[in-house]
Amino acid sequence: MEITEFRQRLEERGFSLSQAQLDQFEHYYHTLVEWNEKMNLTAITDKEGVYLKHFYDSLTAAFYVDFTKVATVVDVGAGAGFPSIPLKIVFPELRVTIVDSLKKRIGFLEHLSETLGLKGTAFYHDRAETFAQKKEHREQYDLVLARAVARLPVLSELCLPLAKVEGTFVAMKGAGANEELTAAQGALKKLGGSVIQNEQFTLPIEESERHVIIIRKERSTPKKYPRKPGTPNKQPLS
């Protein structure tokens, strides 16, 4: 995706980026590629691919969620900062927290945030299972984001405990999302969540299937969830 198309497609969706914001995306791209030579951040390094499959894809969450009405966001397993850093660039008032299990990635994100001049960001090197059991984070966030981290029954156990009651968990998925959603029904019931939207669309240019699944946190998650590190993945809730 060329930068001009990136800008135009966002404008069509009602998001008009300033030159300063476009410059931030350019800096993000160059920093990502530079650091990727030292550590494995992404398999996608060509400029058009990064703009489409990382930047634009991350921002599709805003096509279905009004981020101007969200104060606090936590991104679980953000890797190289997707989707939360692109969203932070477009919605600078967001207070963004990122948790990732790899310390090197957190180092990259701290450097990136500083050089982009982002305010209101926090980064934690932690497992999602232990992070969500800490009282300063548990049920403290308006919105929890995750992009293709794990299958939905597993992801729900990692993410829903972080959402406030009446908050939102947004899972960004590809093809196979409907099957994951079916498999996650039991987990969602146990964790206090309920699906309110499953938005299916096609990523432009490559025409690949995408889903933005919006789950409302209707009641407090039982304290036993998430279970100890590794257990949600080995023994998914059903």
UniProtKB/Swiss-Prot annotation:
The keyword rRNA processing applies. It comes from the Bacteria. S-adenosyl-L-methionine binds at G77, F82, A128, E129, R147. NCBIfam families: rsmG_gidB. Belongs to the methyltransferase superfamily. RNA methyltransferase RsmG family. PANTHER family: S-ADENOSYL-L-METHIONINE-DEPENDENT METHYLTRANSFERASES SUPERFAMILY PROTEIN (PTHR31760:SF0). This is Ribosomal RNA small subunit methyltransferase G. It comes from Halalkalibacterium halodurans (strain ATCC BAA-125 / DSM 18197 / FERM 7344 / JCM 9153 / C-125) (Bacillus halodurans). The lineage of its organism: Bacteria, Bacillati, Bacillota, Bacilli, Bacillales.
